[in-house]
């Protein structure tokens, strides 16, 4: 009996010694690593949590926030920390940020927290890396091609803009942020799954999506009643909806293929209207294109569509809300915008035209300055998640393999050594920068290299960047021609770190007669 008790107690007696040995080995490893690497200055903060709580503390979106400001002042533009439970190199350095993004897949790799993949899906473009990300991105670029931007997308961007603006009543007060979300969601739902604005199924999907989004930006606690738990439930509902659309579309494509086999050229002219609409739908939206031209699995298609709804709707709506906010405080910019767009409208009237075309878009020079400044000052995407694939040395500092790396885009955009009075909304700074530079075919301007990266860079440059700028330009065109607006109550954008208006950006509008 004594011998049995002795064997039972032995592991318990050895446990403190084993834990002490483990702690010693961890400390020894850390000491060796510090000796081996010349790490940037900084500190790790609390065990496990590190400095994450301070880093994520909300702050005014047009500033760096106390955490970044204090750390950059104390340690410089490259420092080390412990964020999201991992040792991290934080970069407010423009050159390092560009170096990180340009070396995607070679020295660095996209590495978002697991909770993001858990809610967006493992096949989401945001979390994919390597060949699979390249293939998914290729599909998105095809969907957002220059030819489609100039024709189908431009036409529908204007149609959906007017759908929203024409609902605004004289002297009414409403959330500009919600209206911007309505515009971008309706547009993406139309071009991804041919869903029309105002329809019951569109409104129901939008309602589920709002619940889903609250979970994406919440703490990943999968407990009943939490935002994350509700978001996972909404995700399941949204995926069932998309899958039902997929099955309907497969039947449409099958019928279309059968008709092409049976009907000859002379009979195609007599194709019924419903057949024509069905064929146009299977050709024009993303769901139809993916089903007809890719070999993606059902799970991959579901995650792709969900992630495109997220990426194509959320960030663009925030950018439009920011433009509305900045412009209401800058009457001079609104006046110059109005002159630019009145000139375009007069020229169209003389030609007997009403709808905007690509030539009109290319004439929106000052509008592009406003867009550039909105994205620079508002910083819709403030930082990116990356991981070092190899030991990397930069400016004498070492970035160890496996460490997380956070290129903080907003820190460069708000750097007073790179922008004069960076916390002020000044769209004219872009006219000064681009003096003598010609606009590109997309209406965008040459920018300040490393200093301006609102859409990221490198192989993961945002696939929807040109669509986002087109949406903003067309929305601004009709906004300044149709309305004056002002804040109905105090509000301003905060970084949580996602950018949001706490009160929804309530505005009062009056029509221009």
From Swiss-Prot:
Distribution of this protein across tissues and organs: Expressed in stems, leaves, shoots, and roots, with a higher expression in siliques and apical shoots.
Name recorded for this polypeptide: Steroid (22S)-hydroxylase
Reactions mediated catalytically: a C27-steroid + reduced [NADPH--hemoprotein reductase] + O2 = a (22S)-22-hydroxy C27-steroid + oxidized [NADPH--hemoprotein reductase] + H2O + H(+); a C28-steroid + reduced [NADPH--hemoprotein reductase] + O2 = a (22S)-22-hydroxy C28-steroid + oxidized [NADPH--hemoprotein reductase] + H2O + H(+); a C29-steroid + reduced [NADPH--hemoprotein reductase] + O2 = a (22S)-22-hydroxy C29-steroid + oxidized [NADPH--hemoprotein reductase] + H2O + H(+); cholesterol + reduced [NADPH--hemoprotein reductase] + O2 = (22S)-22-hydroxycholesterol + oxidized [NADPH--hemoprotein reductase] + H2O + H(+)
Sequence intervals crossing the membrane: 8-28
InterPro entries the record matches: Cyt_P450, Cyt_P450_CS, Cyt_P450_E_grp-I, Cyt_P450_sf
Protein location: Membrane
Family that this chain belongs to: Belongs to the cytochrome P450 family.
Record carries keyword Signal: no
Pfam families: p450 (PF00067)
Top-level taxon: Eukaryota
Keywords assigned by UniProt, alphabetized: Brassinosteroid biosynthesis, Heme, Iron, Lipid biosynthesis, Lipid metabolism, Membrane, Metal-binding, Monooxygenase, Oxidoreductase, Steroid biosynthesis, Transmembrane, Transmembrane helix
EC identifiers of the protein: 1.14.14.178
Biased composition (Acidic residues): 254-269
Record GO cellular component, one term: endoplasmic reticulum
Any one GO MF annotation of this record: heme binding
Sites where the protein binds heme: 462
Membrane association type: Single-pass membrane protein
Role: Catalyzes the C22-alpha-hydroxylation step in brassinosteroids biosynthesis. Converts campesterol (CR) to (22S)-22-hydroxycampesterol (22-OHCR, 22-hydroxyCR), campestanol (CN) to 6-deoxycathasterone (6-deoxoCT), and 6-oxocampestanol (6-oxoCN) to cathasterone (CT). Can also use cholesterol and cholestanol as substrates.
Pathway involvement of the protein, from the record: Plant hormone biosynthesis; brassinosteroid biosynthesis
Cofactor: heme
Chain positions covered by the region annotation Disordered: 252-277
GO biological process: brassinosteroid biosynthetic process; jasmonic acid mediated signaling pathway; leaf development; leaf shaping; response to brassinosteroid; response to jasmonic acid; unidimensional cell growth
């Amino acid at each position: 009996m004594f011998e049995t008790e002795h064997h039972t107690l032995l592991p318990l007696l050895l446990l403190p010694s084993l834990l002490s040995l483990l702690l010693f080995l961890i400390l020894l490893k850390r000491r060796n690593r510090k000796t081996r690497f010349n790490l940037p200055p900084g500190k790790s903060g609390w065990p496990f949590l590190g400095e994450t709580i301070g880093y994520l503390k909300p702050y005014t979106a047009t500033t760096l926030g106390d955490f970044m400001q204090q750390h950059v002042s104390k340690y410089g533009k490259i420092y080390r920390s412990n964020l999201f439970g991992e040792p991290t190199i934080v970069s407010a350095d423009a050159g390092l940020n560009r170096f990180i993004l340009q070396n995607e897949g070679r020295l660095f790799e996209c590495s978002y927290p697991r909770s993001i993949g858990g809610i967006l899906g493992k096949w989401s473009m945001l979390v994919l890396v390597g060949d699979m990300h390249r293939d998914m991105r290729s599909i998105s670029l095809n969907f957002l091609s220059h030819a489609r931007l100039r024709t189908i997308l431009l036409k529908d961007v204007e149609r959906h803009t007017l759908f929203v603006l024409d609902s605004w009543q004289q002297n009414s007060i409403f959330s500009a942020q919600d209206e911007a979300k309505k515009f971008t969601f309706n547009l993406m739902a139309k071009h991804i799954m041919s869903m029309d604005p105002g329809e019951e199924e569109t409104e129901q999907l939008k309602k589920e999506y709002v619940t889903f989004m609250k979970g994406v930006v919440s703490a990943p606690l999968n407990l009943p009643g939490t935002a994350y738990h509700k978001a996972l439930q909404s995700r399941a509902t949204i995926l069932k909806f998309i899958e039902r659309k997929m099955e309907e579309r497969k039947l449409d494509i099958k019928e279309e293929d059968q008709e092409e086999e049976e009907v000859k050229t002379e009979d195609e002219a007599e194709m019924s209207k419903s057949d024509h609409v069905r064929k146009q739908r299977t050709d024009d939206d993303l769901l139809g294109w993916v089903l007809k031209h890719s070999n993606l699995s059902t799970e991959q298609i579901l995650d792709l569509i969900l992630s495109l709804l997220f990426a194509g709707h959320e960030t663009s709506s925030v950018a439009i809300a920011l433009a509305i906010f900045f412009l209401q405080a800058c009457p001079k910019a609104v006046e110059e915008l109005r002159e630019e767009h009145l000139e375009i409208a007069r020229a169209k009237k003389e030609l007997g035209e009403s709808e905007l075309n690509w030539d009109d878009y290319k004439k929106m020079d000052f509008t592009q300055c406003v867009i550039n400044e909105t994205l620079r000052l508002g910083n819709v995407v403030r930082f990116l998640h990356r991981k070092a694939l190899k030991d990397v040395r930069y400016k004498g500092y070492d970035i160890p393999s496996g460490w997380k790396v956070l290129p903080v885009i907003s820190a460069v955009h708000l750097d007073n050594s790179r922008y004069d009075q960076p916390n002020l909304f000044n769209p004219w700074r872009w006219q000064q920068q681009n003096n003598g530079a010609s606009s590109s075919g997309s209406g965008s301007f040459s920018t300040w290299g490393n200093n301006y990266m609102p859409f990221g860079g490198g192989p993961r440059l945002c696939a929807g960047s040109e669509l986002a700028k087109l949406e903003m330009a067309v929305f601004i065109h009709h906004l300044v021609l149709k309305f004056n607006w002002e804040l109905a109550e105090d509000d301003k954008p905060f970084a949580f770190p996602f950018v949001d208006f706490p009160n929804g950006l309530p505005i009062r509008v009056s029509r221009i007669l």
